[in-house]
Amino acid sequence: MKKLKINYLFIGILALLLAVALWPSIPWFGKADNRIAAIQARGELRVSTIHTPLTYNKINGKPFGLDYELAKQFADYLGVKLKVTVRQNISQLFDDLDNGNADLLAAGLVYNSERVKNYQPSPTYYSVSQQLVYKVGQYRPRTLGNLTAEQLTVAPGHVVVNDLQTLKETKFPELSWKVDDKKGSAELMEDVIEGKLDYTIADSVAISLFQRVHPELAVALDITDEQPVTWFSPLDGDNTLSAALLDFFNEMNEDGTLARIEEKYLGHGDDFDYVDTRTFLRAVDAVLPQLKPLFEKYAEEIDWRLLAAIAYQESHWDAQATSPTGVRGMMMLTKNTAQSLGITDRTDAEQSISGGVRYLQDMMSKVPESVPENERIWFALAAYNMGYAHMLDARALTAKTKGNPDSWADVKQRLPLLSQKPYYSKLTYGYARGHEAYAYVENIRKYQISLVGYLQEKEKQATEAAMQLAQDYPAVSPTELGKEKFPFLSFLSQSSSNYLTHSPSLLFSRKGSEEKQN
């Protein structure tokens, strides 16, 4: 899978071109007969999106997601409320623009020449490639040449249809495919892993997130190079909304907010390990139910699933784990650390988890207040792994190399330098295994994403099964019937959504909805 990168050069070029084209519309506040004025008079920004792990999602009634968070900030920027409409597929999104039911599409849509003929793009904010996926263990095609409509299905309105048509005309005349008008890319990927479909095409970011929950989904080949992702608005001669978006993205880019939001949702990396993910999810089923009460009991300010991910990274949930360096137990504490925390038996799971949380809280308390709230945990975890003094060195090195010491995205890139003599020889606390701290935090983020998504998938499946059973037993409530027939519903039920501060969930919804956000 290609490494994700934020295309700031593309943003800059597009911003310059938009500025020239939109100059007559600036300033755009105060005019009474333009799109921005209409939005402000209405008091709400109407945004259409789709339900995916990255763009928009909800847990315990709280919305989140990369596109949602950016759209909410844009609505705040305009001084209006955000009204979100969730559609089932991309075709329905563009129908909303065509019919005047949306001001903006914020759904991880790819910029391409066909779309910009009819719709106005915003500055772009990340990039993806389109990839063909299949189920592990099934035939992996090495080319598109022989694929037929019986094998390949894509979502309606998918940008890749234009690419497929070009490939058919220029390279693969036998290529054919089917468009499923009722399903989006996420549902088609589900069909692939369930054996209902041979192949589909989705973007690289969506695939990477999907694999955290369904490691049996594999990438066969790349269909396109990286393509910039953008929002779309109507192309009708009124450029005031585009001018506002230009100003908004420029401001977000300049003050570092855009980079922080991207780090929050895209910063977990795209390196996928099938065996490791499968092993982890098996442990979720086999081991986690016994440990969950302890994680919930001691998690306190952090989400218990994040604590579980930390413990798995430390010991694979093995209370007897021991390393050659002498650290032991569920949270792999050193003897000195354990003594300072009053732990008498490092191999006692409850003592280890309790002590590990207290040690992590100590690291959290030392993180400077200038670090954004949703990034403090990553600084603390790096300090937990390599020591707080070395975290101070990493921040100092980041500042010396013209990075932002309060940005995890900037600091984590300097962590591997702590083991390189030209750098550590000039630092206060010297050599550190910074590359290990980098991998440590990244792995925890991946495990947390997998855990949250996997538990939600299980809960969704159990709820659907309970609802089906309720049709046969109408006198019994679906909830009680579900708990009776599926006892693990009690294990899956959640009472907290604190993890929203740190990472996106992976619930794939099939239903459209509409809501307002203040």
From Swiss-Prot:
GO process terms (BP): cell wall macromolecule catabolic process; cell wall organization; peptidoglycan catabolic process
Domain writeup: The N-terminal domain does not have lytic activity and probably modulates enzymatic activity. The C-terminal domain is the catalytic active domain.
Catalytic reaction annotation: Exolytic cleavage of the (1->4)-beta-glycosidic linkage between N-acetylmuramic acid (MurNAc) and N-acetylglucosamine (GlcNAc) residues in peptidoglycan, from either the reducing or the non-reducing ends of the peptidoglycan chains, with concomitant formation of a 1,6-anhydrobond in the MurNAc residue
What does this protein do, in the record's words?
Murein-degrading enzyme that degrades murein glycan strands and insoluble, high-molecular weight murein sacculi, with the concomitant formation of a 1,6-anhydromuramoyl product. Lytic transglycosylases (LTs) play an integral role in the metabolism of the peptidoglycan (PG) sacculus. Their lytic action creates space within the PG sacculus to allow for its expansion as well as for the insertion of various structures such as secretion systems and flagella.
Cross-referenced HAMAP family? MltF (MF_02016)
Output a single Gene Ontology CC term carried by this record. Answer: cell outer membrane
SUPFAM superfamilies annotated for this entry? Lysozyme-like, Periplasmic binding protein-like II
Please report the name of this protein according to its UniProt entry.
Membrane-bound lytic murein transglycosylase F
Q: Where is the active site?
A: 314
Which GO terms label this protein's molecular function in UniProt? peptidoglycan lytic transglycosylase activity
Asked if Membrane is a keyword of the record, the answer is yes
Task: For the region Non-LT domain, give the residue spans.
Answer: 22-269
Q: Give the bilayer topology.
A: Peripheral membrane protein
The organism encoding this protein is Shigella flexneri serotype 5b (strain 8401)
In the UniProt record, the gene name given for this protein reads mltF
Question: Which PROSITE patterns does the record match to this protein?
Answer: TRANSGLYCOSYLASE
Q: Does the keyword Cell wall biogenesis/degradation apply?
A: yes
